[in-house]
From Swiss-Prot:
Enzyme kind, highest EC tier: transferase
Xref: InterPro entries: Acyl_CoA_acyltransferase, Leu/Phe-tRNA_Trfase, Leu/Phe-tRNA_Trfase_C, Leu/Phe-tRNA_Trfase_N
Keyword rRNA-binding: no
One annotated GO biological process: protein catabolic process
Top-level division of the source organism's lineage: Bacteria
Reaction equations catalysed: N-terminal L-lysyl-[protein] + L-leucyl-tRNA(Leu) = N-terminal L-leucyl-L-lysyl-[protein] + tRNA(Leu) + H(+); N-terminal L-arginyl-[protein] + L-leucyl-tRNA(Leu) = N-terminal L-leucyl-L-arginyl-[protein] + tRNA(Leu) + H(+); L-phenylalanyl-tRNA(Phe) + an N-terminal L-alpha-aminoacyl-[protein] = an N-terminal L-phenylalanyl-L-alpha-aminoacyl-[protein] + tRNA(Phe)
Keyword Cytoplasm: yes
NCBIfam families: aat
Protein name: Leucyl/phenylalanyl-tRNA--protein transferase
């Protein structure tokens, strides 16, 4: 386990432990966050606890040709129940991701400090959001880090059925059109698996991340 201080430094991802934890400490300075994502590392920790930096093996990703859109979801998309926008209200999206209640979780890992840091990355054009609207009301969305050829998804929320799925599918289709290589989903999630995401070796993920 590496301990981070003020220096902008991360150890090789191969040094992560079996759970995927690579380092502890440091801060959420935008420059550190940018270095982290470019290095295949992301922060994930509970509010009030030290910052943990992760580089899990395997890594959950979506290759766009493997995106699964069910028949029922296609009907919803075709009915145009929702309106999808990009980067129209980043702060409201990340705030909703913080506040939404999730099954099996007592609290949130998205602290106010994280919101401030990612909003700064949004101002720099690096953190981006997808918004899903119904009758002019924000009902779903997601946010993440855009590396230009890989998009690192961070969190999503849904206030009505299928809103977060709509955000995810819309983003995947957009990234495919723009010739991105993959959508990074970080760790296994059965919901994401149903949409076509799968786990790959960290070595393969890093190879794709470092190629442009």
């Amino acid at each position: 386990m590496y301990y981070l201080f003020k220096d902008l430094f991360f150890p090789p991802v191969s040094e992560a432990d079996e759970e995927g934890v690579l380092a502890i400490g440091g801060d959420l300075d935008p420059e550190r966050l940018k270095l982290a994502y470019k290095s295949g590392i992301f922060p994930w920790f509970n509010e009030g606890e030290p910052i943990l930096w992760w580089a899990p093996d395997p890594r959950m990703v979506l290759f766009f040709d493997e995106l699964v859109i069910s028949k029922s979801m296609r009907k919803i998309l075709n009915k145009k129940i929702f309106k999808v926008t990009y980067n129209k209200n980043f702060k409201e999206v990340i705030s909703n991701c913080q506040q939404i209640k999730r099954e099996g979780q007592n609290g949130t890992w998205i602290s106010n400090e994280m919101i401030e840091a990612y909003c700064e990355l949004h101002k720099q054009g690096i953190a981006k959001s997808v918004e899903v609207w119904q009758d002019e009301v924000l009902v779903g969305g997601l946010y993440g880090i855009d590396l230009g050829h890989v998009f690192c998804g961070e969190s999503m929320f849904s206030k009505v059925s299928n809103a977060s799925k709509t955000a995810f599918i819309a983003l995947a289709l957009y990234l495919k059109k723009e010739n991105y290589k993959l959508l990074d989903c970080q760790v296994y999630n059965s919901h994401l698996e149903s949409l076509g995401c799968r786990e790959i070796d960290r070595e393969e993920f890093m190879s794709i991340l470092k190629s442009k």
